[in-house]
Amino acid sequence: MIEYRNLRIAVLGAGAVGAQVVRLLLEQGEDLAGRAGAGLELVGVAVRNPDAPRTADIPRKLLTTDAESLILGADVVIELMGGIEPARSHILQALNSGADVITANKAL
């Protein structure tokens, strides 16, 4: 079996799109890792309210309201919050910390 280096992934936002991205990372992580050529470790999901209902079952231990700390521990940040702020600030923080950023944010 091939061993890949792990990429630590942080997801910002768990609305309709974010929750489904998290679901795919959790359910198809091994397949995605093979395609990416790297292990994928979901380190957390930043949300406004950890107790809000979600469209996917996200383990409570992955949810946090501390996006800044989550970003600092990530190699890849997937921004799916929408809007301009705080998404813009979080993206800039991620880039400044050396993380790669993926976003579907049309406002930015």
Model regions and ranges:
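N-terminal glycine-/serine-/threonine-rich beta1-alpha1-beta2 phosphate-ribose binding loop
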Residues: M1-A99
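Short, acidic/turn-prone active-site loops that include or flank metal/cofactor-
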Residues: E68, K106-L108
